[in-house]
Structures are given as C-alpha cells and as structure tokens.
Design a protein with these regions (language model features):
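Hydrophobic transmembrane alpha-helices and their helix-loop junctions in integral membrane proteins
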Residues: 2-47, 56-253
Length: 253
C-alpha cells in the first residue's frame, strides 16, 4: 500500500490533490508502527496506547482531502473509536486493581465476576475498532479517505485491531472465558451480519459497499471467536485464518 501510494499521490493522478503528501506519509508510517506495537505488546496498557495512536492517525488520514465531508467523517471516526476505547480503559484499570499488573496473562488469574468486567470492556472496545453494531457508523463514511488508506487502514489493518485484542484476551484466559461473553459476542455478530447484508442493497458507491462488506466479514470473525469460548478450538483457528484471508482479499480492491 505504501508503494502504491507513491504512484497514487502524483501529478499523474488528476483526481487527487498534490499537496500534503508529507502529512499523508507521516500519518501512514506512524500508523504502521503503532499497529506493529499493538500486535507485539504483551500488556493491556501497551495495547491501549497503540489503540489510541491508530485512532489519531486514522483521523488524520480520513480527513486528508480537507473537504467538509472528509473532515466530518474523520471526526466521526475519531469520536466513535475513542468512545469504544473507554471499554479498554475499564478493562486495563480492573486488571491492574485486581492483580497489580497490566500483563495480559494475568487475565487467567481473575475470578469470574472480574473476568466478566475485563472481557466486557475489551469486547466493547473491539466492536468500536472493528465497526460492529452498535458502533459501526464510522466505517462507511471513512471511505472519504484516499483509496490506499481505505485499502490498508479500513479494510486490511485498523479494523482488525478489534478482533485481534479480543482473540488475544481469549488466548490469555487459558480457555476460561465467561460464557456470557460468548453469548453476547455471538448475538451481536449475527445481528451485525444481518444488518450489514441488508445495507448492501441500497449502496451505489463502490467504496461504501466494500465498507459494509468489511463489517460483515469481521462479524464472521467475531462469531468464530465467540463460538470458540464454548470449547471448539477449530472455531478459534478458523477465525484467525479468516483475518488473513480477508486482509489479503480486500486489499486487492
């Protein structure tokens, strides 16, 4: 995507403004670094830090064109994803108060009620970042961003943050996740799937159609991860495999 941008942001592309390329690459490269940091972080505090950085970079990239519509879409994405981050703040605070550490592996030592709070917060944050109901509204509007941004951030990378932190929490719990989280995850994934499919029909803009496609594909991953809470390891492995499948396929668009 970065290499493609070097051709996309040129005078040869008549439909694209030719100013602000330094700003574009700065936000894009910081975002890539933040994604690497989030994936490699072994603490929920580290995840929270990089979670917020990706949100800020997304705001800068969605609003790159500086039009009224793109700036409004950028602010919408920033607000919704930051409201979702409240769940991660809650989970981090609860984990630290209960165990004295931010290490994700400490989740396995929590009692059932505390674990429910931590997983509830993580799941809420994951819904916001991965554009699941009721926090899905920002993603279709985020397609105001330049096409390389839509391909990388909002189809292949940023939207995977939510499913990643949820999957990482499930792994850290050593298979002991409250079943209520599984039922809530399954229910919301199915509702998002149905709603997303219905929203395919009225779309006339291809990028918005792809955004709704991303939302429903992420619902499949949430559905698989939620089912895995009840025992089937194949569901977890299938969900993880589908993260890569969707990222490669959607980036082609």
């Amino acid at each position: 995507v970065s290499l493609y941008s070097t051709g996309y942001l040129t005078d040869g592309n008549r439909e694209h403004p030719h100013e602000g390329t330094r700003r574009y690459y700065a936000f894009l490269l910081i975002f890539i670094g933040a994604m690497a940091g989030l994936v490699l972080s072994s603490t929920i505090l580290g995840q929270l830090l990089f979670f917020e950085i990706t949100g800020g970079c997304s705001w800068g990239l969605i609003g790159y064109y500086q039009s009224e519509k793109s700036l409004r879409s950028a602010m919408k994405a920033l607000l919704i994803t930051h409201v979702a981050s409240i769940g991660l703040y809650l989970a981090a605070a609860t984990l630290f108060v209960s165990t004295g550490t931010f290490e994700l592996t400490a989740i396995a030592t929590l009692d059932e009620p505390t674990k429910l709070i931590v997983f509830g917060g993580i799941l809420f944050a994951a819904w916001g970042k991965s554009a699941q109901l009721p926090l899905q509204a920002w993603l279709p509007d985020a397609m105001e961003a330049p096409t390389p941004v839509s391909a990388y951030l909002h189809a292949a990378s940023m939207v995977k943050v939510g499913v990643y932190i949820f999957a990482r929490a499930i792994m850290s719990a050593d298979g002991d996740v409250p079943h209520l989280i599984g039922w809530v995850g399954i229910t919301m994934a199915v509702i998002t799937l149905i709603y997303g499919f219905m929203m395919y029909l009225p779309q006339k803009d291809m990028k918005r159609l792809l955004a709704w496609s991303t939302i429903t594909q992420l619902s499949y991953i949430f559905l698989a991860l939620s089912i895995s809470i009840f025992g089937p390891r194949e569901a977890f492995e299938g969900g993880i495999a589908y993260i890569f499948n969707h990222a490669f396929a959607k980036s082609l668009f």
